[in-house]
């Protein structure tokens, strides 16, 4: 609306998707709802690399960013490669991340379902 003349650097973090020990009305996915808002960037990390890189990128972004976290991923341990711990490590918002390359099928997922997709890729 401002033609790029104004910035709104703010980060919103929130739980999204299926959760443990809550009613069905509390386990909805807001990714498409937020994603349909013009100018609002939405990220949904899966592993430690995504969390660190995307949250740092969100904090540095001049536009509003929503970070959608799956509660069931809290407490899940991932190995952190050395490059992830580098102080300059960030993941570019808006660019797809390829977790596993293949030649027969493309599987697209976000958040918790990335893990399930990688399992499915092994079977396929």
Question: How should each PLM-predicted stretch be described?
Answer:
Residues 1-116:
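Conserved thiamine diphosphate
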Residues 116-124:
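Short helix-loop-beta junction
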